[in-house]
């Protein structure tokens, strides 16, 4: 049998000639740099998965943002929501600091939300709605909050 004839090898996980480089996960920046220097095929992906918790669409949005080339600004609170927070706070004679302690947040967060600079967080908005007794999400922003559903 000459070297140039194809040979058939039977078995599990058989590699002829030692096979090629196996796929491996680089855990450090040094390993990534080493792979780049040696000219190996390289794919750098972030993993946004968690094991025992409910997945949130935030990871999908982060992946989408990572893959896009243009700059995407994060969402901000609408100015009408900020005005409603300010009006509701003043109706109850609360300072920003008082409202912040009532909802267990920092006064800077209340300030950011009132000025329209804050990044919307449903938990914080829910706490503010209950503390002020007005709607801050959905339609009819600024209207009194209805009682619990029966």
Swiss-Prot record:
PROSITE patterns: HTH_CROC1. Residues 1-29 are annotated as: Disordered. InterPro entries: Cro/C1-type_HTH, Lambda_DNA-bd_dom_sf, MBF1_N. CDD domains: HTH_XRE. The keyword Transcription applies. It comes from the Eukaryota. Residues 96-115 bind DNA. Pfam families: HTH_3, MBF1. Keywords: Activator, DNA-binding, Transcription, Transcription regulation. SMART domains: HTH_XRE (SM00530). Residues 85-139 form the HTH cro/C1-type domain. GO terms for molecular function: DNA binding. One of its GO terms (cellular component) is nucleus. Transcriptional coactivator that stimulates GCN4-dependent transcriptional activity by bridging the DNA-binding region of GCN4 and TBP (SPT15), thereby recruiting TBP to GCN4-bound promoters. Involved in induction of the ribosome quality control (RQC) pathway; a pathway that degrades nascent peptide chains during problematic translation. Required to prevent stalled ribosomes from frameshifting. Belongs to the MBF1 family. This is Multiprotein-bridging factor 1. It comes from Kluyveromyces lactis (strain ATCC 8585 / CBS 2359 / DSM 70799 / NBRC 1267 / NRRL Y-1140 / WM37) (Yeast). The lineage of its organism: Eukaryota, Fungi, Dikarya, Ascomycota, Saccharomycotina. The gene is MBF1.
């Amino acid at each position: 049998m000459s070297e140039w004839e194809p040979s058939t090898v039977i078995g599990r996980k058989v590699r002829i000639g030692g096979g090629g480089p196996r796929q491996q996960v680089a855990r450090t920046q040094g390993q990534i740099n080493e792979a780049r220097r040696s000219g190996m095929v390289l794919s750098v992906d972030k993993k946004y998965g968690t094991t025992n918790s409910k997945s949130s669409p935030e990871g999908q949005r982060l992946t989408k943002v990572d893959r896009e080339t243009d700059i995407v600004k994060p969402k901000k609170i609408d100015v009408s929501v900020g005005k409603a927070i300010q009006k509701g706070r003043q109706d109850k004679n609360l300072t920003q600091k008082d409202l912040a302690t009532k909802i267990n947040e920092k006064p800077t967060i209340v300030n950011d939300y009132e000025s329209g600079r804050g990044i919307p967080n449903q938990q914080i908005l829910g706490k503010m709605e209950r503390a002020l007794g007005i709607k801050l999400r959905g339609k009819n922003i600024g209207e009194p909050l209805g009682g619990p559903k029966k």
